[in-house]
């Protein structure tokens, strides 16, 4: 199989990378009706598999889970999750031939084996669904001509997909139809109904492409979402301890600081996050972020280039074939880091202290978000897609670090994201070593000294923050989500 993106000519590549349209609410007036009365069989019962299935069932769809015979015989976790929630469970051979829509929600590295197992069992004219397009775009999986191939990609972990649905809302979602597999022209109707069944239409849906989803998703998770948080955690912890800060305090400031800082990001973008700082601290964070962007721009560009060319996927799939040797080695190295093993700290850190003592962390978030966004735009990805794959998902990833440090983040994200995270963070840490020696008092674990504020300089900084393109598109998208949430709650 050949990388699908690399088989396209330049015009086709640019067209698919740039596919992104914010869909209006009235396009979902039919909600999930197109799939009602049809059989939906989900393969995989992990976080996305279970929680999407629960939402779809609550939306009136007929849901069953197809598992491998050994998973059923051995009553594995996937079997227990499905049966304990009252779902029909059966083997591929028993359920797949009945399915009008087969939804593949297994991990990326299992996709080829799963698709090759289910495809011969699928009836003529059925549909195959994904929530991430890696198998189609990077692996280049060929699907039978009569099968419609669609994608519904919630921009949140599976648990969040369920919780937002239970609140009467949903999570922002990308949908797409594979242009090589839509013989009956019903792909968009299927994708819209599936998205509505998960609640995504109540939070905002982008009509995208498999290519745009994969390339932007890989870029976001490797750089700002995971790689930058991991590199920042390791660097900031080691710096504080070397400067004599109590290890427990340093660890807690980082572990819970990312979540606190990015909560402001979620509510009001980079503007609100920076507004949580004093004026001298804001000016210092801005200066630090500009330095960081200059240093790291080549690394962000390299990751984007390797994603676009397919080099990243080729390298990672070679590690799959080598029993994940690199992935498992890097995971072990991360687990042995000083930050992962810092002593518990019983003292209290106030919400504002996370900002006041985490000026460098704020700068890292700002630099990483803007660099990821700008680099995606330069590669032809549309602003809305770039926003969702950089700023929007960052608070969700930061929350995993707050739970159990980097270990939890790397367990929750996909193996694909984890592999890319290590590539980025292991390059970023040495790249920023010299920069870390230039830090001043107040950049970490102390307040920035108040040495006066230049009004004109502050004015220019505020204007630069607010006029960055991610702030402009972010304000629009957050406003839409807020409006939709009000409608959902009112209903």
Swiss-Prot record:
UniProt name for this protein: Ketol-acid reductoisomerase (NADP(+))
Cofactors (names): Mg(2+)
Cofactor note: Binds 2 magnesium ions per subunit.
Pfam families xrefs: KARI_C, KARI_N
Organism: Proteus mirabilis (strain HI4320)
TM annotation in the entry: none
Reactions the enzyme catalyzes: (2R)-2,3-dihydroxy-3-methylbutanoate + NADP(+) = (2S)-2-acetolactate + NADPH + H(+); (2R,3R)-2,3-dihydroxy-3-methylpentanoate + NADP(+) = (S)-2-ethyl-2-hydroxy-3-oxobutanoate + NADPH + H(+)
Native organism taxonomy: Bacteria, Pseudomonadati, Pseudomonadota, Gammaproteobacteria, Enterobacterales
Binding-site residues, substrate: 414
Keywords in alphabetical order: Amino-acid biosynthesis, Branched-chain amino acid biosynthesis, Magnesium, Metal-binding, NADP, Oxidoreductase, Repeat
Entry annotated with the keyword Electron transport: no
């Amino acid at each position: 199989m050949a990388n699908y993106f690399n088989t396209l000519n330049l015009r086709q590549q640019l067209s698919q990378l740039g596919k992104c349209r914010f869909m209006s609410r009235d396009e979902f007036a039919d909600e999930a009706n197109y799939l009602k009365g049809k059989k939906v069989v989900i393969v995989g019962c992990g976080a996305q598999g279970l929680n999407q299935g629960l939402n779809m069932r609550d939306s009136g769809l007929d849901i069953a889970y197809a598992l491998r015979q050994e998973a059923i015989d051995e009553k594995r976790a996937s079997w227990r999750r499905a049966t304990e929630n009252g779902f029909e469970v059966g083997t591929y051979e028993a359920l797949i031939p009945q399915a009008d829509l087969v939804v593949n929600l297994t991990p990326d590295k299992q996709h080829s084996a799963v698709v090759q197992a289910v495809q011969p069992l699928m009836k003529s004219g059925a549909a195959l669904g994904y929530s991430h397009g890696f198998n189609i775009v990077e692996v280049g999986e060929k699907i039978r001509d009569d099968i419609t191939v669609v994608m519904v990609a919630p921009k949140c972990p599976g648990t969040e997909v369920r919780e937002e649905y239970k609140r009467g809302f949903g999570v922002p979602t990308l949908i797409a139809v594979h242009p090589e597999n839509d013989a009956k022209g019903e792909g968009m109707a299927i994708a819209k109904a599936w998205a509505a069944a998960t609640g995504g239409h109540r939070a905002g849906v982008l009509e995208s492409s498999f290519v745009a989803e994969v390339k932007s998703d890989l870029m976001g998770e490797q750089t700002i979402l995971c790689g930058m948080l991991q590199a920042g955690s390791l660097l900031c912890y080691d710096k504080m301890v070397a400067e004599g800060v109590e290890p427990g305090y340093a660890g807690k400031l980082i572990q819970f600081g990312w979540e606190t800082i990015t909560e402001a990001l979620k509510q009001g973008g980079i503007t609100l996050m920076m507004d949580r700082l004093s004026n001298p601290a804001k000016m210092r964070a801005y200066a630090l972020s500009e330095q960081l962007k200059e240093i790291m721009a080549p690394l962000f560009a390299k990751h984007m280039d390797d994603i676009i060319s397919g080099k990243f996927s080729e390298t990672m799939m070679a590690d799959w074939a080598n029993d994940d040797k690199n992935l498992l080695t890097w995971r072990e190295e991360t687990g042995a880091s000083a930050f992962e093993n810092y002593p518990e700290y019983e003292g209290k850190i106030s919400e504002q202290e996370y900002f006041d003592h985490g000026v460098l962390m704020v700068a890292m978030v700002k630099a990483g978000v803007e660099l990821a966004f700008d680099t995606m735009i330069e590669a032809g990805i549309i602003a809305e897609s770039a926003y969702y794959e950089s700023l929007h998902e960052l608070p969700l990833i930061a929350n995993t670090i707050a739970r159990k440090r980097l270990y939890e983040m790397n367990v929750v994200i996909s193996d694909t994201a984890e592999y890319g995270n290590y590539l980025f963070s292991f390059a970023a840490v040495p790249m920023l070593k010299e920069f870390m020696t230039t830090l001043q008092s107040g950049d970490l674990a102390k307040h920035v000294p108040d040495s006066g504020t230049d009004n004109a300089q502050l004015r220019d900084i505020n204007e630069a923050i607010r006029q960055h393109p991610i702030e402009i598109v972010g304000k629009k998208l957050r406003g839409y989500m807020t409006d939709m949430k009000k409608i959902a709650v009112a209903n």
